[in-house]
């Protein structure tokens, strides 16, 4: 299986979403614990339920604690998608409510993964130059990517409406969000 091979051999950053999370939920957990890759998992509540073997009600009742516990146990960064998205590496916890109902459409997870890949390729190097992150640059970068994605989605919904919104609408507004952050 390709994912098992990557977990055993890959040493870079790896975003796992959708079907990859289903595969991860069904494989030997020691592969996750022993990987040299920097895993970024981006589940929604049901996917996280399968990963953790906890009920969706348990996760909804304590999303921060559940995500933090899993991240600590497996040495991964978790981005738990929901009305308030939780991002944690087990130590640092970030929460963003950026996003909107129009983003609940096919392809939105792919857009998020693309934004995360771009931000996580660039931002940790910039963050490392600043003090105060103490090895948590990846979690900060994932949180920044989630925020950019959510704000771009909000702009897309504001301008296009939620009913007709498609995933690529979010992409159309990422540059505007990034530019506004650079000006801030």
Residue positions per predicted region:
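Adenosine-phosphate binding glycine-rich loop
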Residues: 81, 133, 149
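Short pre-catalytic strand/loop immediately N-terminal to key active-site residues, enriched for Gly-Thr
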Residues: 95-107
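Charged C-terminal helix
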Residues: 150-184
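Glycine-rich phosphate/dinucleotide-binding loop and adjoining beta-alpha-beta core of small-molecule
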Residues: 1-97, 182-183
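Short, small-residue alpha-helix embedded
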Residues: 50, 105-130, 137-148
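Feature representing long, continuous alpha-helical segments
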Residues: 65-69, 113-114, 118, 172
């Amino acid at each position: 299986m390709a994912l098992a091979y990557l977990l055993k051999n890959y040493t870079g950053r790896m975003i796992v979403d959708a079907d990859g999370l289903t595969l991860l939920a069904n494989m030997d957990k020691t592969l996750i614990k022993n990987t040299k890759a920097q895993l970024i998992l981006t589940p929604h509540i049901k996917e996280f339920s399968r990963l953790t073997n906890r009920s969706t009600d348990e996760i909804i009742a304590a999303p921060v604690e559940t995500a933090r516990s899993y991240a600590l146990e497996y040495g991964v960064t978790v981005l738990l998608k929901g009305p308030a998205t939780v991002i944690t590496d087990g130590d640092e916890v970030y929460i963003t409510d950026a996003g909107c109902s129009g983003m609940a459409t096919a392809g939105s997870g792919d857009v998020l993964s693309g934004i995360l890949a771009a931000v996580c390729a660039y931002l940790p190097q910039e963050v490392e130059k600043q003090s105060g992150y103490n090895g948590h640059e990846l979690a900060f970068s994932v949180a920044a990517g989630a925020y950019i994605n959510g704000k771009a989605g909000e702009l897309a919904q504001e301008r296009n409406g939620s009913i007709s919104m498609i995933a690529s609408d979010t992409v159309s507004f990422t540059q505007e969000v990034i530019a506004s952050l650079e000006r801030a």
